[in-house]
C-alpha cells in the first residue's frame, strides 16, 4: 500500500458532475468553441504561445539561472541602530530601514600605491570605519583560502595593507571583532589581533605546519565547523577564545598533482608534484585539541583543561559560546559522537562547571552550533531565562527548542510535536520574550519562520499561513528590530527586509526580475512533490517530468540520489539544474526522481538513526523499492531505469546497483567505495570505530563485483586531486572489477580536480560526459523521427 496514485499526479479527473450538468456544460462549451473559431477566422490573428528555447547544458553548468541575493552586513554606523550595508554594482551603500541611503565606498576608491585593487571579497567592521578586502585569493580547502588583505579607511579614504613592517603577508583568516574595528587574523598558523589603535598584537608563537591557532585543520574544517575559523570574540571585544589543534600524530595521505602548480619552464616540470595532507581515517589518531582564552588587555592566554581524565576520550569540539564578557560555554562530543557534554568556564575565576552530559544507546549527535544566550541587559521580567542557554534538543523523536539551565536541572522545552526545529534560536527578543526559529511544522520539505512566546509557549507563524508553500532562511539585525527574509523556493527567490515591531513594514532587496525574464523564454520540466509508502514507512519524493508529458508514451526514468545521514534533497527549493535539463531537453525527456530514503533528515530521528553502524543497507533498499514502483508505471520503460549520484550519492548509486536489480544503468561520481578509506570524524559518527564494528564496515563497502556484471552498463568518474573522497576509492573499485572480469563499465578521470571536479574546465567536461553517457544508456530522441535510440541495447 502506498500514498502515490494517478489522482495525485493529476492524470485522472475526479470531478463529480451529474449527467444533466455534463450535457449543459458540453453544449455551452460547443457554443464557446464555435464563437472562438469564428473570431480567429475573422481576425486572422494567431494567439499561439511563443516558442520556448530548451535549456542549455552550458548555461546550467555556468549557473546562468542561479538566483541573486544581496549581501547584507549589519553595522553600527555613527550610533544609528540597525543600519546595514548592501552592494549595488561597484557601490557599497549604507542604509537604515527608513531614511538613510548613502554610498560608503566605491570599488574605484580601492587604490594602493596608485594601483587599482582587484578584490575577491570584502567585509566591514561593525563601526563601519574600515573595509577589509582580500586580493590574490587561492583556495585552501572547501571553506578556506589564502589571500592578501588591505584595509580601507572610510573616513580618510586611505588604503593600507594588513601585515607588519611593510611586509605583505599571505593570511589564512581575518575576522572583525563584534564591536569597534579590531581584527583577528592568522598568519603562518599563529593568531594576531590588529587593535583599534592600529597596533598588531601577537597572541601565539607555536604555529607550525602541524599546529593551528585559531584556524581549522582539514578535518575540523570539513566535518565539524564547516568554517576555517576557531576564533570566538567576547561580546565586549576584550577577549578571544580559540582552539589550538595539533595534528602531528595524524598519518599523512599523499596524492600526486600532474598539471597543477607546475611551471613548464622549470626542470622539475617533468616530474609530478606530491601533495601531502594530514587526513585521519577511521581508527587512526585525530587532532588533539585545546581551548585557550586570550585577554587582549593583559596580553595573557590561559589554557583550560576541559576534557582530561574522563570517559569522553578524544573530544571533538562542536561549539564555543560566550555567555557573558567573562564566561564561555563549550560543547563537545566523544570521538564517535554518542555522548555530548556542555561545560561552563569562568575565565576570571579559572573555574569549570559541567552543565550537561548525555549519551545515546542508538544513533549519534549531529554537529550543531545553535546554542544562544538570552540578550544581555534584558528586562527583569525575563530574568529567569538568563541563567542558562537555548539550544535544539531531541524530544520524542524530533528536534525542538529547549532552555537548558546552568544548574543542571532538566531542560524546559519550548516546542514539541512531530516536526523539527531546523534552525534556532535565530533571535531572542529580550523586550517581548519571543524566540524566533525555522521549522518543518507545515511540511518536512519546507522551512518557515516562527516565534514562540516564553510567556505562553504559543507558536506564531510569520511565513506559514497554512497554504502557501515556501522554503525560507533569515538573518536578524544585532538589535533584533529588523530581519532579512530570504525566500528560496519553490518559485523564483526573492529577498526582503522586514520588522519585528511593525508587521506592515517591508523593503524589497531583491526580486530577481532578470531571472524571471530569462525563465519566461525557456522550457522547464513540471515538478511534483509527494509521499511514497512501503513496508509501513513513508518517504518524500520529487519527480520531474517533460513539459509535454504524454501518458501514452514510454519514458526512461533516472533516479538522482544523495542519501547521506541527516541530509535532504527533496525540498521545495527553486532549482534549474542538471536534473531539470535531462527532464526537459527534447533530446532526453527523462522522468527524473529523487527519493529521500532512510537515514536522511527531517522525518524523525528513528528514521535517521536506522542506518547507524550499517551504512548503505537501508538506503539502497529504499532506492530499489522506489525504482520498482516507478518501473511498474504504465508510462515508464522498465528496461531503461537508471540511477546516479555524486559523493555519498555516488556511493549510494554503487551500493544500489550492487544490491537492487531494478536499475540497468548507473553513474557514480567521486564515490566512497570503502568506509575504512574515508575520514574518521564523519565515518565514526555513523559507523563507530572499525575495531568495534568489523562486520558493519565489511558489509558497507562495495564488494560484490559479480552483481555489477549483470548490469547493462555503468559509469564512474573521479578527480585525481580529490582531497575529500580520495581517488584511492575508485582505484579500489577498479581493482575489484578487474579481478572479477567485469568489463561493462566506463570511467572518466579528471587530472588534479578536487571533489567538485572543476579544475581546468572540468566542470563543463564532467557534465557533458554525464549527459552523453546517460543519453546513450537511457536513450536519446532522434529529432527527425521522434524515436528514442539506445546505444547499448
Curated annotation (Swiss-Prot):
Residues annotated as transmembrane: 25-45
Gene3D superfamilies, sorted: alpha/beta hydrolase (3.40.50.1820), Dipeptidylpeptidase IV, N-terminal domain (2.140.10.30)
Keywords recorded for this protein, A-Z: Aminopeptidase, Glycoprotein, Hydrolase, Membrane, Protease, Serine protease, Signal-anchor, Transmembrane, Transmembrane helix, Vacuole
Enzyme class label: hydrolase
Matches recorded under Pfam families: DPPIV_N, Peptidase_S9
Bilayer topology: Single-pass type II membrane protein
Glycosylated residues (UniProt): 101, 136, 246, 299, 303, 324, 336, 377, 384, 407, 535, 761
Intracellular or extracellular location(s): Vacuole membrane
PROSITE patterns with a match to the protein in the record: PRO_ENDOPEP_SER (PS00708)
Regions of this protein lying in the Lumenal compartment: 46-793
Catalytic residues identified in the record: 647 (charge relay system), 722 (charge relay system), 755 (charge relay system)
Lineage: superkingdom: Eukaryota
Any Gene Ontology biological process: protein processing
Name used for this protein in its record: Putative dipeptidyl aminopeptidase C2E11.08
